[in-house]
Amino acid sequence: MATNEEHLRKPEWLKIKLNTNENYTGLKKLMRENRLHTVCEEAKCPNIHECWAVRRTATFMILGNVCTRACRFCAVKTGLPTELDWQEPERVAESVRLMNLKHVVVTAVARDDLKDGGAAVFAETVRAIRRKNPFTTIEVLPSDMGGVYENLKTLMDARPDILNHNIETVRRLTPRVRARATYERSLEFLRRAKELQPDIPTKSSIMVGLGETKEEIIEAMDDLRANHVDILTIGQYLQPTKKHLKVVKYYHPDEFRELKEIALSKGFTHCEAGPLVRSSYHADEQVNAASAARQMKA
């Protein structure tokens, strides 16, 4: 596999089939009418057409669409965020109802400008969804909220069905990939989430193709399992713009299959691994797998 940064060409298995049927256009219209953001759009997710047009799922992004951090892999805008919108939780909940979602993922930009990192709005969004959609399972994907224990507790007290927090890359590359976060703080965040609510599954994600080694990926798996993480997703890093980090390597689908086998052998209850896998990819299937694993342990 060629790894020359300047001459890497996107392989055939990363070619995406675009689908803009009425599900896609209807979902986009619903988001605009309710003044809502999705990470699908803001982060230029390659699966947006499959999720919106075929699966009719979306990942809501709350707390605005401007992030206080400038991670070098991420396409979300960076700058000074807008004021908090306390009506946003109700609008998200109503959109979930209109979409008739069985599983919903809620993520957010990092809000280092807020003392609680946005935890109060995040928690209220979970509660609002629960009130209007009592049978919908809820997955939350927050930033590290500054590593403040009280902020995490506020969110976990709202009782989401899955707590997802991404380490994004291996230990060695973290300072280069996401300079305003730390590898250890993310692991601590995941460990404390499990300590606060032991029955709530935790989840994390790793991007590959940034220059990591196979041994470093396996080390990251071990670190996640040591901190009681249940679910893992592994996907190919794709450069959003020329200003972002370049792709060092495109992994072959066979390599992803091998990584999945290794992850499952480490004790993860579920692992999604593939070129186009993202943190929220087939999230509805992951919550079902986590539920089945809990029942087996009971």
From Swiss-Prot:
Keyword vocabulary terms for this entry: 4Fe-4S, Cytoplasm, Iron, Iron-sulfur, Metal-binding, S-adenosyl-L-methionine, Transferase
GO MF annotation terms: 4 iron, 4 sulfur cluster binding; lipoate synthase activity; metal ion binding
Residue spans crossing the bilayer: none
Main location class: cytoplasm
Entry EC no(s): 2.8.1.8
SMART domains: Elp3 (SM00729)
Gene3D superfamilies named in the record: Aldolase class I (3.20.20.70)
Free-text remark on how the cofactor is bound: Binds 2 [4Fe-4S] clusters per subunit. One cluster is coordinated with 3 cysteines and an exchangeable S-adenosyl-L-methionine.
Catalytic activity: [[Fe-S] cluster scaffold protein carrying a second [4Fe-4S](2+) cluster] + N(6)-octanoyl-L-lysyl-[protein] + 2 oxidized [2Fe-2S]-[ferredoxin] + 2 S-adenosyl-L-methionine + 4 H(+) = [[Fe-S] cluster scaffold protein] + N(6)-[(R)-dihydrolipoyl]-L-lysyl-[protein] + 4 Fe(3+) + 2 hydrogen sulfide + 2 5'-deoxyadenosine + 2 L-methionine + 2 reduced [2Fe-2S]-[ferredoxin]
Residues bound to [4Fe-4S] cluster 2: 67, 71, 74
Domain Radical SAM core residue range list: 53-269
Cofactor(s) named in the record: [4Fe-4S] cluster
SUPFAM superfamilies registered for this protein in UniProt: Radical SAM enzymes
Stated family: Belongs to the radical SAM superfamily. Lipoyl synthase family.
PANTHER family: LIPOYL SYNTHASE, LIPOYL SYNTHASE, MITOCHONDRIAL
Protein name, per record: Lipoyl synthase
